[in-house]
């Protein structure tokens, strides 16, 4: 009876991990940092997130109007 109980507890633990989203790959998620320079109000129309990527030579950073794409040059 004890091995069956242990197996049931193990299966329940695995199911609970899946219900919480499973294992998370921290390298896959991009961290959005605060912009190094204060952006102009014109840049506030170019919103981004780690789902919506910015163009080349631009990074997604957090500003007063939300997450925006800002030039790194």
Curated annotation (Swiss-Prot):
Tissue specificity as recorded in UniProt: Ubiquitously expressed.
One GO MF term attached to the UniProt entry: serine-type endopeptidase inhibitor activity
Protein name (Swiss-Prot/TrEMBL): Protein WFDC10B
Signal peptide (residue range): 1-21
GO cellular component: extracellular space
Taxon lineage: Eukaryota, Metazoa, Chordata, Craniata, Vertebrata
Subcellular location(s) per record: Secreted
Keyword list, A-Z: Secreted, Signal
UniProt main location, coarse: secreted
Top-rank lineage group of the source organism: Eukaryota
Name of the coding gene: WFDC10B
A single BP term in Gene Ontology: innate immune response
Ranges of residues in domain WAP: 28-73
């Amino acid at each position: 009876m004890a091995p069956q109980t242990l197996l049931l507890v193990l299966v329940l633990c695995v199911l609970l991990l899946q219900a919480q989203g499973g294992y998370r790959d921290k390298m896959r998620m991009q961290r959005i940092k605060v912009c190094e320079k204060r952006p102009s109000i014109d840049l506030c129309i170019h919103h981004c997130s780690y789902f919506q990527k910015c163009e080349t030579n631009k990074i997604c950073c957090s500003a007063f109007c939300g997450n925006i794409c800002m030039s790194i040059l």
